[in-house]
Amino acid sequence: MLENNNGEMFCPNDEWRVKIKRRTHMLNQKYNSLTEYQPEARGEIIREILGEMGENVYFQGPVTFHYGKHTKVGNNTFFNFNFTCQDDTEVTIGDNCDFGPNVTIATPLHPMLADERKELMCPDGVARRLCYAKPVHVGNRCWICANVTILPGVTIGDGCVIGAGSVVTRSIPANSF
């Protein structure tokens, strides 16, 4: 279930959302405490974190997922050190991708206008700042180099190379460098 996928404002501190995130954060810590010499245990934990995961997927670690369950990873994909995924809504990653160290995928957004960033009343009667989220999609056979940040609403087409240090603010057509 993609609770935050409609682009509408939501309260990230709703009790049920916090419960999911705390569970995922605990699993992140568990995964990160294991060494690469414990592949079976790491595999079990990462499968608990992710919504879907294909075959032959490897996360070097450490990893940080926000929800985890909103992320789907295809087959034969490698993630180097320090992969961060703020998956407040859907993140899909295709087959045969490589991610360099320190890659961040972010789906949440806060309003751009100052008046819209003020605290609003949540369903539980507590005033909080709201946010919204836009999905991120990475196609097949992509290479996302070191220190790349992919921002909300971006689609990276099949066969792309995103150069080291890039901040991806807009969608990228297939087979682009």
What does each model-found stretch correspond to?
Residues 2, 49, 128, 134-135, ...:
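Short secondary-structure boundary/capping segments
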Residues 8, 101, 146, 164-166:
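Gly/Ser/Thr-rich helix-start
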Residues 35-36, 67, 87, 172:
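Residues at alpha-helix boundaries and short interhelical turns
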Residues 54, 98, 173:
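Short conserved AdoMet
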Residues 63-73, 78-155:
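Flexible, glycine/small-residue-enriched loop-and-beta-strand segment within the central core
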Residues 149-177:
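C-terminal/domain-terminus segments
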